[in-house]
Each structure stands twice: as structure tokens, then as C-alpha cells.
């Protein structure tokens, strides 16, 4: 039976259409996915992300452990609260999961991992943490609400006490701080400013209701997906998985190659891939009528006249832009245009960088 987050009752009271999402009953939308999408781009919306897993790591060798576990390097984290995005790779360089890691003290770090990968993530982390003597605590006692949009931080701040407001005021992106009952982080999955707030399960419903009263619109998984796709953000299982290199998923920037003597899981395989080349992730824009959908083939001819085929990993109609966009994994050598096969029609598409909207503005 699918699990329910502590906010399940709030979703039903708000009129949500609930669906099974990786064994969690989650809101798909509350009536209009388009309205929810636009609320985040123009004002403030919120998402229940309590299905994600928060994992606290403690021990004197925690930093050393994470420098081995992750492709990005937590040696970069020197200021308490600073966060880092990274892939957690297998030995062949495939992506077990993408996650965020927060640094608090030398013996205390926090991971936030995806819900669909929870069990394999915890198994992998536990297996590799043992030699380092790491204490692992899964924070199932916490719920998490993402408040996103140009007015999200101001509206959320009306619920904070003086100490919380003082600490988060002017906090830069990718930081997190614990103040009282709230863990407040300047992270998100929409391409907009906002907070991701973790708080005790028993306080989540009251906090959700207070956000509604503050003018924050409840949003479901549908809007979350169109928002993240516009922002060019990967979805695990679509842009990457255990068979796909981060180099083929626009995650090359998350691999810390320096220092060269740092050994991390998957490094050896990545070195070979970097030398010989991989596929790459690109953006596609189609202004013609129609919608680019997942798994449609993408065809192009390179400069030498050779024909190649890739695949759309995520595609949708963009509510912000008013036309269809997609992320596609394609061979090297793609030019500025390609062809996508939609049923029996060959549709021309423009090839772009894999990001379409940032802070409400078109970049594609």
C-alpha cells in the first residue's frame, strides 16, 4: 500500500488529485496544473516534498567518507550550512542518485536524496560508510515543504520568528540553517528563488495551512515537472540512471577532477569516458504545433554527413514559453537543428543549451 506524508489530509482538503508516485500518495494537481505553474513563475507556490529522504551523517571521518562517496568534492564546503549538488556513482560511472549535501560541522553533514531511490541509496551509503565509522540517521521524523517563486521567500518569512528571519535574511543560494524547529534551505527544483523547509512531522500541517493563508498556492507533481524541465533540471530515471554517465547527463560540472589524487567511486570509469567521449544532453525547442514527448527519437546529420539518432529524455509543453521543449540525450556532433519523429511526421526542432527558463525569463 502506498505511503502517505503527514500532509496527506491537507492535500485532500485543498482538493488535490492524488496519485501513486514511487509508493507515495502525492498530489498531481489541485485543479489546474497550468495555474500552479504560473503561480511559481510569477508569485509563490509550494510543494510537499516530504517523500524525499533526509539522511544525517555523523563521525570524525564524515568529510573523508563523502569525498570518497561523491563525484563532487565536499572539501569545497568550508562555511557551515553551505550545500553542494553531486552525483553518487557506481564503479562503472553510472548515477545511483543525484543529491544535495549540507555541511554543518566537521563531524556532521546532511544528505537529501530522492524518494524513488531511497532503499538502494541507504544500502549503498551504509555499505560504504562502515569502514569510516559513520553514524547514519534517517530523519523520518521530518517533513519538507518547498516554497518557490519570486515572492516565496517574503511570504514564507511571515511565518518565521524574529531569530529565523534574522538568520535567513540575505542568505545566499545553496545554504541551509537550523533555527528552532525549522531547517531552512535556499534550494529548490524550479529555477526560482525560494526555500525548502524541513520541520517536525507534527508541525507540518499547521505550517502548510499558514502558508496557504499567507497567499502561497499549493502545487502538485505536474507543475513541479514542467517547472524543473523549463529550468533544465534533471529527473532521476529519465536524464540519468545507473547505466548513464553524468558526462552524458549535463552533470560534468558536478565532477571534481581536482585534486587528481582524490579517489572517488566511479572515477576510473569517468576518466576513460572523458577521454573517449560520451553522448551529451541538449535542449530542444519546437515552435510548430505539437508536443515533444519522452522517448521520441531525435535524428540529425553531422558535419561529415553521417546520420545519428538520440532520444528525448523529458519533453513537455512549456506554460511559460508557450511552445514545446525537451531534454534529449544525443551523440556528439549535433548542430543547431534536428528532426524529431512525432507519429508519422518529421518535425524540425532547434537545438539549444539544456535550460529554457531562469527566474521567470526565457533563456532558450
From Swiss-Prot:
Catalytic activity: N(6)-[(R)-S(8)-aminomethyldihydrolipoyl]-L-lysyl-[protein] + (6S)-5,6,7,8-tetrahydrofolate = N(6)-[(R)-dihydrolipoyl]-L-lysyl-[protein] + (6R)-5,10-methylene-5,6,7,8-tetrahydrofolate + NH4(+)
EC number: 2.1.2.10
Gene Ontology BP term (one): glycine decarboxylation via glycine cleavage system
Keyword Kinase on entry: no
Transferase keyword on record: yes
GO terms for cellular component: cytosol; glycine cleavage complex
Entry GO MF terms: aminomethyltransferase activity; transaminase activity
Keywords annotated in UniProt: Aminotransferase, Transferase
A Pfam family: GCV_T_C
Record text on subunit structure and interactions: The glycine cleavage system is composed of four proteins: P, T, L and H.
Role description: The glycine cleavage system catalyzes the degradation of glycine.
Protein name from the UniProt record: Aminomethyltransferase
Organism field: Shigella flexneri serotype 5b (strain 8401)
Amino acid at each position: 500500500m502506498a505511503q502517505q506524508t503527514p500532509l496527506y489530509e491537507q492535500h485532500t482538503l485543498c482538493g488535490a488529485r492524488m496519485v501513486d508516485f514511487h509508493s507515495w500518495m502525492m498530489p498531481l494537481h489541485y485543479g489546474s496544473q497550468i495555474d500552479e505553474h504560473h503561480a511559481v513563475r510569477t508569485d509563490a507556490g509550494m510543494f510537499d516534498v516530504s517523500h524525499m529522504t533526509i539522511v544525517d551523517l555523523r563521525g570524525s571521518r564524515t568529510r573523508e567518507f563523502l569525498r570518497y562517496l561523491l563525484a563532487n568534492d565536499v572539501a569545497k564546503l568550508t562555511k557551515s550550512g553551505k550545500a553542494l549538488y553531486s552525483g553518487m556513482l557506481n564503479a562503472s560511472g553510472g548515477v545511483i542518485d543525484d543529491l544535495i549535501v549540507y555541511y554543518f560541522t566537521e563531524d556532521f553533514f546532511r544528505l537529501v536524496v530522492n524518494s524513488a531511490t531511497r532503499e538502494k541509496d541507504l544500502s549503498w551509503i551504509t555499505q560504504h560508510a562502515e569502514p569510516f565509522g559513520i553514524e547514519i540517521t534517517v530523519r523520518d521524523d521530518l517533513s519538507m515543504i518547498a516554497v518557490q517563486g519570486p515572492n516565496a521567500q517574503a511570504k514564507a518569512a511571515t511565518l518565521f520568528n524574529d531569530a529565523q528571519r534574522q538568520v535567513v535574511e540575505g542568505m545566499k543560494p545553496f545554504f541551509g540553517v537550523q533555527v528552532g524547529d525549522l531547517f531552512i534551505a535556499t534550494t529548490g527544483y524550479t529555477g526560482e528563488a525560494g526555500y525548502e523547509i524541513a520541520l517536525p512531522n507534527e508541525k507540518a500541517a499547521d505550517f502548510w495551512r499558514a502558508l496557504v493563508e499567507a497567499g502561497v498556492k499549493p502545487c502538485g507533481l505536474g507543475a513541479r515537472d514542467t517547472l524543473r524541465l523549463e529550468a533544465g533540471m534533471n529527473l532521476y530515471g529519465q536524464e540519468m540512471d545507473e547505466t548513464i554517465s553524468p558526462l552524458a547527463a549535463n552533470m560534468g560540472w558536478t565532477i571534481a577532477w581536482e585534486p587528481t589524487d582524490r579517489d572517488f567511486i566511479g572515477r576510473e570509469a569517468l576518466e576513460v569516458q572523458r577521454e573517449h567521449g560520451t553522448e551529451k544532453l541538449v535542449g530542444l525547442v519546437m515552435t510548430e504545433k505539437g508536443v515533444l514527448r519522452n522517448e521520441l527519437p531525435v535524428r540529425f546529420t553531422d558535419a561529415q554527413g553521417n546520420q545519428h539518432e538520440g532520444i528525448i529524455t523529458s519533453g513537455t509543453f512549456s506554460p511559460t514559453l508557450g511552445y514545446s521543449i525537451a531534454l534529449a540525450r544525443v551523440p556528439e556532433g549535433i548542430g543547431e537543428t534536428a528532426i524529431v519523429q512525432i507519429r508519422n511526421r518529421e518535425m524540425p526542432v532547434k537545438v539549444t543549451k539544456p535550460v529554457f527558463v531562469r527566474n521567470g525569463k526565457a533563456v532558450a
